């Protein structure tokens, strides 16, 4: 952890009504004496002149002083809030840097200091950047929930439960002469299953939080001429894909990135799936399957004029059987303007079924609402937290250790191996909040922040 005193502009570069210079570290009071001529009363707004060493006034504004550890970073912090012209702010930073021992902060270094001083855990620190970068009200609310500790609390609760179970297992190993066989009395198995269930719930919430932050990848797939490219154009609101009556027009992957009420959606149009002797079309079909395998959702596009079926297993069983397990599928029956079928939304064999006309736009708004719902859109903006890819990976790793531990217990009654899997699970979970985290990971996370944050 650095003991340097750092300084940076905390507001965005450019012209604005107010500009803020932030100083954090032991020399913050020295800066106050040099620039203001006094140290402001802690946590009180002080309207004063910001002066050169000669006494010439650079600007007038509000000075705020926070005595550590009662500050954002846990150190002494001075904020100078002046007028937002970039020249004025540059002059003020130049003046502050005349105090010996200061340096310009690196991106994210104020948040990193807060993390190092236990003012924030890692998920809360990341939530600051996510709140700044939020592209929707839902993303902003979820990031704020993470900043306030909702995600951290759930992870800490899991760590505590895993730790307690590990201690119980190790006690059973250390005292083998006790009359009760702790490994087979059912208590450990019940506790382990309870933890696995809770972790499953956190994983589901985290995946939803990741979609809110990073967007959902939706692949439009189906046979040639089902209307896949027309649907891409309808969702994107522009002519992104060429649409013709010729089967196999789309031979490569087409991508569109759109926002539905601010929520990011990555739409992938793919080549029509069929057996073909055309070499180029074969390559396009393989690329289509590559996209399907990494999708969050598949829109199974069906030409409604070719079949009345709504159950995807009946429409094309080979396609459904080839899909990855747990990949969500929405059946989209296209060309409702020609079939005359009702636009009702139904569920068949566990899959949502939508009737639309990609050409005329009938039913497309309902499909958009469906996609928003899948991404976690909530009109009341209550609940949920933001999550990143690294959080999902850590949760997956923790889950795998729990399942391995369960196998060691149920199949082999191997208490030592169960205890080791619980220890590995504990470490994986603790990486989320930064309890056990490499310096390389910390550097990567905080370097993506804004300077001054």
Swiss-Prot record:
List of residues binding (6S)-5-formyl-5,6,7,8-tetrahydrofolate: 22, 79, 119, 453
Keywords of the record: Cytoplasm, GTP-binding, Hydrolase, Magnesium, Metal-binding, Nucleotide-binding, Potassium, tRNA processing
Membrane-spanning ranges: none
Any Gene Ontology biological process: tRNA methylation
Bound cofactor: record note: Binds 1 potassium ion per subunit.
Disulfide bond residue pairs: none
UniProt binding sites for Mg(2+): 229, 250
All copies of domain TrmE-type G, residue ranges: 215-376
GO terms under cellular component: cytosol
Residues engaged in binding K(+): 225, 244, 246, 249
Chain residues that bind GTP: 225-230, 244-250, 269-272, 334-337
Function: Exhibits a very high intrinsic GTPase hydrolysis rate. Involved in the addition of a carboxymethylaminomethyl (cmnm) group at the wobble position (U34) of certain tRNAs, forming tRNA-cmnm(5)s(2)U34.
Subunit comment: Homodimer. Heterotetramer of two MnmE and two MnmG subunits.
Sequence similarity: Belongs to the TRAFAC class TrmE-Era-EngA-EngB-Septin-like GTPase superfamily. TrmE GTPase family.
Protein name per UniProt: tRNA modification GTPase MnmE
The organism's taxonomic lineage, starting at the top: Bacteria, Pseudomonadati, Pseudomonadota, Gammaproteobacteria, Alteromonadales
């Amino acid at each position: 952890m650095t003991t340097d005193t750092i300084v940076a502009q905390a507001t965005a570069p450019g012209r604005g009504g107010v500009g803020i210079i932030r100083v954090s570290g032991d020399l913050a009071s020295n800066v106050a004496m040099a620039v203001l001529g006094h140290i402001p009363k802690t946590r009180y707004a002080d309207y004063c002149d910001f002066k050169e060493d000669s006494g010439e006034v650079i600007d007038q504004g509000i000075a705020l002083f926070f005595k550590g550890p009662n500050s954002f970073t846990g150190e002494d912090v001075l904020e100078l809030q002046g007028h937002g012209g970039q020249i004025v702010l540059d002059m003020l930073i130049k003046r502050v840097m005349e105090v010996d021992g200061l340096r310009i902060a690196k991106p994210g270094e104020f948040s990193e200091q807060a993390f190092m001083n236990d003012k924030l855990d890692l998920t809360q620190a990341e939530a600051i950047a996510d709140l700044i970068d939020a592209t929707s009200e839902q993303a902003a609310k979820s990031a704020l929930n993470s900043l306030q500790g909702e995600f951290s609390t759930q992870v800490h609760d899991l760590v505590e439960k895993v730790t307690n179970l590990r201690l119980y297992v190790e006690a059973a190993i250390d005292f083998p002469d006790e009359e009760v066989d702790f490994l087979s009395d059912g208590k450990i198995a019940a506790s382990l299953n309870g933890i696995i269930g809770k972790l499953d719930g956190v994983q589901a919430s985290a995946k939803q939080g990741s979609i809110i932050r990073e967007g959902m990848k939706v692949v439009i797939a189906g046979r040639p001429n089902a209307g896949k490219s027309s649907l891409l154009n309808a969702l994107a609101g522009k002519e992104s894909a060429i649409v013709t009556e010729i089967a196999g027009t789309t031979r490569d992957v087409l991508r569109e990135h759109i926002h539905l009420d601010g929520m990011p959606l990555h739409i992938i149009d793919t080549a029509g799936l069929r057996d073909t002797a055309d070499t180029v079309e074969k390559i396009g079909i393989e690329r289509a399957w590559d996209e399907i395998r990494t999708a969050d959702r598949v829109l199974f596009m069906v030409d409604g004029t070719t079949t009345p079926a709504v159950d995807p297993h009946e429409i094309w069983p080979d396609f459904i059987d080839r899909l990855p397990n747990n990949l969500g599928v929405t059946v989209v029956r296209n060309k409702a303007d020609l079939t005359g079928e009702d636009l009702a939304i139904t569920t068949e064999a566990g899959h949502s079924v939508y009737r639309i006309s990609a050409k005329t736009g009938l039913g497309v708004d309902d499909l958009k609402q469906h996609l928003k719902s899948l991404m976690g859109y909530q009109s009341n903006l209550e609940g949920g937290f933001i999550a990143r890819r690294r959080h999902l990976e850590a949760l997956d790793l923790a889950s795998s250790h729990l399942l391995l531990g369960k196998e060691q217990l149920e199949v082999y009654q191997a208490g030592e191996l169960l205890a080791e899997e619980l220890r590995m699970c504990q470490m994986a979970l603790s990486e989320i909040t930064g309890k056990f985290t490499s310096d390389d990971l910390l550097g990567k996370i905080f370097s993506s922040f804004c300077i001054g944050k």
